[in-house]
């Protein structure tokens, strides 16, 4: 609401703050003021009864565009203020025009000076006359010395009709250095204009190159010619790269084959073929039994010698079910004894001891028996068999203490497991150890 009130107040006071039409030309303001004067004249005539003039009215109502009235022409009813304003405007425009003309003249003078300076610089670079003009401020003795140096330095220095000029460096009004330079004509380049100019290929032609080589030593010429014309380095590089590639391939192939051999050895080492015959013949070798009691063996006493094995009839082949049951019991007791004595390792395998490339191999945990020592079998029963007798089997009485020595090299007698289910006949001179069934 407060903003609306402020806006209304500004609208009321706006005509007082409006700026007069000072930016418009004087003749346009005079034409704008003419209708107001005409209206006031008509009102006065109506009141007095006289007829106003129609000249200005007709000129305004026709709406024709013509030339602007001149500043000298005065309206029919001019005022002193309009005449003074018109004079001031004319003075201002004249002053502005003069300023513009002066600035343009200054810019043209500066441009001409720059152009002259550029021409002088070019003349100093490429013109002998300009060089002489530049040295005109020097002493005559110095000028003569420069001319002598120029003749001495520029003689046979530039080729192919090139323009030669010297750059003289003064120190304490004395000539300290003279540097000749050549301005080459079209088609030549170089410090002495001795090379053909080839666009986008900045290399000397073969003839000039050979001429330049003549100034070198013999060894340098040979090296430059060999490096520019021979392809031996490129072929040598290709051969070296080929040898390196073949070496890398052979090394990788050997490494892969070695890894496969290690894996095969590890698999065979972890699961040897002899491990599957451990129950029948441990380690696949014959086991000699030093102390084997006879079938009619009784509990020995100290100082007595056990009798030999009797082959009397009365023993028979064990039945299939009894053999299988005895085999399972013997297997459990046999492995428990070996594991308790530290011969067979535990089933758990430490992953830290296994190589990394073996962890991904499927593992078969089969423990092979490699035992050389004494095994103490307590409560081991024996049974002798004979093919001719079909009576009930006679069980050997269990000895108080039986020691079996397992050796690797001897192969006197055969230790046969009661796992035979095919009904093979046993030897009458041997007794098979049996685990007592409870």
Swiss-Prot record:
UniProt subcellular location: Membrane
Glycan attachment residues as annotated in the record: 161
Biased composition (Low complexity): 69-85
Cellular component aspect of the GO annotation: extracellular space; membrane; plasma membrane
Primary role: Probable ligand for tyrosine kinase receptor let-23. Essential for vulval induction, where it acts downstream of the synthetic multivulva (synMuv) class genes. Probably by activating let-23, phospholipase plc-3 and inositol 1,4,5-trisphosphate receptor itr-1 signaling cascade, plays a role in ovulation by promoting gonadal sheath cell contractions and spermatheca dilatation during ovulation.
GO molecular function, one term: receptor ligand activity
Cytoplasmic side: 254-438
Annotated TM spans: 231-253
Keywords: Disulfide bond, EGF-like domain, Glycoprotein, Growth factor, Membrane, Signal, Transmembrane, Transmembrane helix
Protein name: Protein lin-3
Inactivation phenotype: RNAi-mediated knockdown in combination with double mutants for the class A and B synMuv genes lin-36;lin-15A, lin-8;lin-15B, lin-15AB, lin-35;lin-8, lin-8;lin-36, lin-8;lin-9, lin-8;lin-37 or dpl-1;lin-15A results in suppression of the synthetic multivulva phenotype.
Stretches for region Disordered: 35-94, 410-438
Biased composition range(s): Polar residues: 36-62, 411-428
Disulfide bonds: 154-164, 158-182, 184-193
Domain EGF-like: 150-194
Membrane topology: Single-pass type I membrane protein
Signal peptide: 1-13
Membrane topology, Extracellular segments: 14-230
BP terms from Gene Ontology: egg-laying behavior; epidermal growth factor receptor signaling pathway; inductive cell-cell signaling; male genitalia development; nematode larval development; ovulation; positive regulation of ovulation; positive regulation of vulval development
């Amino acid at each position: 609401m407060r903003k609306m009130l402020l806006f209304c107040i500004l609208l009321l006071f706006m005509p007082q703050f409006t700026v007069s039409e000072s930016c418009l030309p004087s003749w346009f303001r005079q034409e704008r003021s003419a209708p107001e004067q005409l209206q006031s004249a008509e009102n006065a005539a109506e009141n007095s009864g006289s007829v106003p003039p129609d000249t200005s009215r007709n000129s305004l109502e026709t709406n024709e565009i013509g030339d602007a009235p001149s500043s000298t022409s005065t309206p029919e009813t001019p005022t002193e203020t309009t005449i003074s304003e018109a004079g001031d405007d004319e003075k201002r425009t004249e002053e502005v025009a003069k300023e513009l003309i002066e600035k343009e003249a200054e810019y043209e003078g500066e441009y001409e000076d720059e152009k002259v300076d550029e021409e002088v610089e070019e003349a100093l670079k490429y013109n002998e006359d300009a060089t002489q003009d530049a040295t005109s401020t020097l002493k005559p003795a110095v000028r003569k010395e420069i001319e002598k140096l120029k003749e001495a330095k520029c003689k046979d220095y530039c080729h192919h009709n090139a323009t030669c000029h010297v750059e003289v460096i003064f120190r304490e009004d004395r000539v300290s250095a003279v540097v000749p330079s050549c301005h080459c004509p079209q088609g030549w380049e170089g410090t002495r204009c001795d090379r053909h100019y080839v666009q986008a290929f900045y290399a000397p032609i073969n003839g000039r190159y050979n001429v330049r080589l003549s100034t070198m030593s013999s060894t340098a010429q040979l090296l430059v010619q060999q490096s520019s014309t021979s392809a031996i380095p490129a072929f040598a590089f290709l051969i070296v790269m080929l040898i390196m590639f073949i070496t890398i391939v052979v090394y990788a192939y050997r490494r892969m084959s070695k890894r496969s051999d290690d894996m095969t050895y590890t698999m065979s080492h972890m699961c040897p073929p002899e491990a599957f015959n451990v129950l029948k013949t441990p380690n696949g070798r014959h086991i000699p039994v030093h102390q084997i009691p006879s079938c009619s063996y009784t509990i020995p006493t100290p100082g007595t010698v056990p009798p030999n094995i009797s082959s009397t009839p009365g023993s028979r082949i064990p039945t299939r079910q009894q053999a299988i049951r005895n085999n399972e019991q013997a297997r459990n007791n046999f492995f428990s004894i070996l594991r308790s004595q530290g011969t067979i390792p535990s089933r758990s395998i430490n992953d830290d001891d296994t190589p990394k490339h073996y962890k991904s191999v499927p593992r078969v945990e089969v423990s092979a028996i490699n035992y050389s020592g004494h095994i103490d079998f307590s409560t081991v029963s024996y049974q002798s068999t004979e093919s001719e007798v079909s009576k009930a089997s006679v069980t050997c009485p269990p000895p108080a203490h039986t020691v079996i020595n397992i050796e690797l090299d001897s192969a006197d007698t055969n230790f046969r497991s009661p796992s035979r289910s095919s009904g093979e006949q046993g030897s009458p001179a041997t007794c098979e150890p049996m685990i007592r069934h409870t």
